Amino acid sequence: MNDWIAYFGPQNRYRFSLGELKITDDNLSVFETGHCRFLNDRLMVHDDRFIMVIDGLILNRKELFNLYQTDDLAHLVVKMREKNPDDFFQAFRGPFTGLFVEKNTHKALVFTNQTGDSAVFCYQRGDLSVFSSNFYLLSQFLKENRLPATFGVQAAHWMLTFGFQIDASTFIQEVHRLLPGKAMYLNNGCWSEVAYHRFQSGDLTVSEEEAVEQIDGLFRQAVKRCFDKDLEYGYRQHLADMSAGMDSRMVNVVAQALGYDKITNISYSQTGSEEERLAKRAVQHLGNKLIFGTLDPHEFIFDLEKLTRMDFGTYLYCGITGGERLLSKIDFNAFGAEQTGQLGDIAIGTFVKTASNAVNPSAVRCSNWLPLDSRYDVNPEHFENQDLYSLYTRGFLGAMSSWFVRKNYTFALSPFIDVDFMGFCYNLPLDYRRNHRLYWKWVKRYYPDALTIPTSRKRIPETLFEKSVDFGQRGLHKALRIGHKTLHGMGLTRSSVSARSSMNPYQYWYDTDPAMRTFFNEYYSKNLSLLDDFPETAAEVRAMFESPVILDKIMALTVLAARNVFF
């Protein structure tokens, strides 16, 4: 897949051997890398009036063509900008980034999409401003041109405490990420950053029945946008994720209801796990084909630097688990985009359990082993409640980071993050979304057959009988967990997680695989000295690696890999 990097500054002063120079003007150069599988959604135009760059997928491109009565993307952008000069791109849906320059006024803007599945990274120094859709490429541009680049200790702290970047920080201190829903504007020679879109919590006055009806209509529209993109490019066979959860199967169920019948599912997990069993049952129930990737042996654990480079150090390196290795083996001549159910659990649900305007950053942390550094603001975007804070940090900046890895093979899509769908859901009263209350009502009303497919997501018990059974099952599971933890503490079990049967039993692997322990220990010992100039970060990495919890060690190694890969 392709990426772009552009710099505003003196022409011919800077070089970039990893990209092909596509556009050059008085003070702007644009380079392109890779290859594009979706050319009709790609724009790289330079004429006497404008410079236009768009990368990604515009899922509602044909809708906009009909609205503006054109069938040319460049012409569409010009007409949209005439109507909305500052934020025409807010009407786009999908994973996109872009750049627009009006040559006679010397005005420019750079933008990213609303939901974090695409990104723009920015570097500014003196008369030079560099923007790129790929953080690794930007790091190499800085290195090749010997431009100042300092290790980002704040990004390291976020990685070691949250497991992902909760703000615009990157592992290069001089580079910041343009956050979801934001754009950069050049006016009178000065750049400014503006939010053009932000989801809002609301209390929309609508009954649950009306809400369910609108949810179904908007979700079907979102699924259609995603799957029609495959058909636009002649891909008759759709590639769709399938897990043990509810979200991926609802994408598949609704897609089938809309007539998309040629679906191949992809799934990956530990052999013999509940994840594998439930995912395969769902595939069989729906009559789809299946490409399954086993996580044993867990070879992706050793792809430390490769995965860190691919996800730009935005998330702990193994967040995608075996997904990258499985995608690398798929022949994408037969498939278009990767259809996923990403963030479905918070679109019609929520990360929070109680309504509160207070923001608790610790609620989205992957680890509480280290204290948060009081020098850093944990809520720089001033989110007004936990619901939105969790959506943007844990959701858009955390979970969506795996899409940077996936983009090396194809674009990933999810109807749950469709802006129209998600915007409606977040305007509903929180009580509707809590405990997936509205989610289950939607499925029960419109897709009752989906409830016959076993899932790892538990329904909230409704009848007295269901509540009594649920109470007994939870008591049994709790007793088993406590018993296993006690045995582990006595040294009578090898792993603190009885989860060899879970999807990603990291602790089990670490406890039972000498090669994994050797790899972790050797990488840590060999690379800790890279942080000699950053003693506070080195101390935090040391503390995390010495933690008995495997996830803490993974977070520590991610920081060391970032120090290696981006410098």
Give residue ranges: language-model regions.
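Short, flexible coil/linker elements and helix-boundary hinge sites characteristic
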Residues: 9, 19-22, 69-71, 145-146, ...
